[in-house]
């Protein structure tokens, strides 16, 4: 059912997808779908949680495989995230839905709230990475973490959005490492990312 929901959301967007269409795509009755999920938002939340759990498991594995301190691990996990985004169909479709097909409308308010809840969780994780990098002296102790988090999210989200929406498709595998390198260099060195 989750894969059917992913496919249907990917094709039609969230606002234009009905539970009936998802049930048909899954080859089950609408009643069977309601047995597991009370509404479309509940299904989207379960899908979001499942994919986020998978991403977290991949990040944990990446961290285990990486050499160096937490800052090097952060770089390694970001590189692997973008590799998976380009090569894994489920990741691709899920992020495509989030960035291009999660309409910000009144009828989609519950879905947007779910997405924001998960964004807040990732914001906390990025803040924890920055805190550890400061403690390990990989980053300056006067790092403005709030601005740094905004900078990281803007860079990563901007790269993802640009890749999905670009008419001239670029090679994410070649571009992402360079953008990540520039971002991390700025986090390490740029004076505007220091507390005033």
Residue ranges and their predicted role:
Residues 73, 86-113:
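Amphipathic alpha-helical segments used for helix-helix packing
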Residues 53-56, 60-61, 68, 72, ...:
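Amphipathic alpha-helical packing segments from all-alpha helical-bundle domains
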Residues 11-15, 66, 88, 136-137:
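Short coil/turn segments at alpha/beta junctions that flank glycine-rich nucleotide-binding fingerprints
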Residues 46, 60-93, 145-152, 192-193:
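Hydrophobic alpha-helical connector segments
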Residues 4-42, 46, 50:
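Helix-turn-helix
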Residues 62, 66, 99-102, 106, ...:
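Secondary-structure edge/capping motif, primarily at the C-terminal ends of alpha-helices
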Residues 76-84, 120-136, 150-196:
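C-terminal peripheral helix-coil segments that are non-catalytic and often amphipathic
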Residues 40, 47, 51, 55, ...:
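Hydrophobic/aromatic residues within well-ordered alpha-helical segments
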